[in-house]
């Protein structure tokens, strides 16, 4: 029996938005290269942020349906009891070491990180808030601090 590592990458809202966008984006291309052929997964929080962004921007029904079709092509990690506990532990762990994910303003980001930790997968993000978060494996091309 082998210890097979889960396959896939959780991507945050910024990255998946870049992937869904049809405009050329060299940074998005770098993330595509890093992710390669691994399956892309979304946290439920990312789906909420995508839908909110579409509503806030006043997208029409056709464009919102196109977004929903793109989301439906991917696996969405839904919260379960273990993810909820991981999110609480992550907040406490971050608060103890002074990491910004411990702050309330980052509740959404923390859920995305908790989804990646729960699934045992890396998180692809261009957001520096995730750098150095306990238990989180981060894939990024963002410049360091």
Which residues make up each language-model segment?
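Active-site neighborhoods of divalent-metal-dependent phosphate/nucleic-acid chemistry enzymes
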Residues: 2-3, 75-124
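Acidic, PIN/NYN-like endoribonuclease modules and their adjacent C-terminal/linker elements
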Residues: 1-4, 113-145
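General small-molecule cofactor/ligand-binding pocket signal
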Residues: 41, 77, 139
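Generic structural signal for small/hydrophobic residues in well-ordered secondary structure
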Residues: 12-13, 50, 87, 116
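Short, well-structured N-terminal submotif of metal-dependent ribonuclease cores
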Residues: 1-42, 52-69
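A generic structural signal for short hydrophobic patches within well-formed alpha-helices
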Residues: 16, 47-50, 130-131
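Short, hinge-like loop/turn segments at secondary-structure boundaries
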Residues: 57-61, 94, 140-144
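Histidine- and aromatic-rich ligand-binding microenvironments
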Residues: 11-12, 43, 105-106, 127, ...
